[in-house]
């Protein structure tokens, strides 16, 4: 059908359990944009919206289901309260649609940018675009326009950002520092591409010289770019296949040469690469994968990455996945976000981001441990905190009046158990268990346990060296926290706080 784009958004009513149908937009006989949606004009579960801003005021051809009736609007309609019932209270979610990996993380001009894998047309994976949001503090987010649209070359898979302050790529226009976004174009071939912004991240333009890297093996993806200041070079971490990863080098961010390939046991896809200075003053490089297996290493005289110890593990569940650090700049905290894979049942949106974490490196008993703690900004969310520091307890209970809460323990005494929103957590001599997840304890005498709960997931941090995210839909009838120990437990720190934005 011919379609005059009279307003920005085209309504797409969808049935969650429906069959996907193909929509293809063409101009002058050439397909330019396509997506799949479970189109259901009768009794849809939710409405989604095709953003056709690039075609406003023009006539295009739309190949759509035979019974499709085009309806335009100026803006998406707000969701009904019932549709938002399970929206996490303090964790990032898309307004609509599925999200997964965090992408293009950077801090620029006082704002944290979060780009993310996004399906604008349903609550399940597909149609990979890059969504976009900005925040002054990593908790209060403002949704921005869809940043990268899938095209006829492929979907927009994961990638990273660079704040190109020295204009190494030569893409600066005007006074703004260019922001560079590396991503995988996933179509018939999987190639590494570049988009850039010269207006502070508001608009992304696909680079005319794409791809930067051709397909080397099928499915190679997820470029993460960082500057190696000591050797004055740019590095790109890339996933190849199986458990095989690599590193490329460049001087101009446009032309890349393979430096090396190696295996990361127990992991696949979504590499991250960044330096950290340990608590003993030694600066080392972290190379990690989507499952949070990680190497601690350094570069040798030939410039090759060499792990200095056996592979480590930070995350002990598959619910916290595909973590990425914000673009590294010396002297600033190393902050990362991970995708929380916990389902949000029945909502027009699905998936969230884990609590933003600050990354550190600690030498414990001669081994380096990658550590993650919630960023300090979580303190600004605390409401109605109960403190029982320095007390000895066997039993404790209190109601919880908010959707989100934080519980923090510090103790040398174990074991004990607790229940939060109906979820059982056991603190034992060897570590912390919750559901199928077990977080092992290091050699440290004191156990520091931090628990962050929201509507559909609970995160647990043990001494920073082991973390997990456990899917758990809150039961409103169990909106409480309780603790029980067979023998008295002395708590150097014991705090229960409700959280809210």
Language model features with spans:
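Conserved Ser/Thr-centered positions that define the repeating blades of beta-propeller domains
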Residues: 26, 135, 197-198, 247-250
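An acidic-aromatic loop/edge-strand motif
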Residues: 70-81, 185, 190-194, 198, ...
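Hydrophobic alpha-helical membrane-insertion signals
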Residues: 18, 23, 53-55, 65, ...
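Beta-propeller domains
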Residues: 20-22, 26-29, 93, 109-110, ...
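Structural motif
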Residues: 21-22, 125-129, 189-194, 243-247, ...
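Hydrophobic core segments of beta-strands in well-ordered, beta-rich domains
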Residues: 12, 62-63, 101-121, 143-147, ...
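Beta-rich accessory regions
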Residues: 1-34, 49-68, 76-78, 290, ...
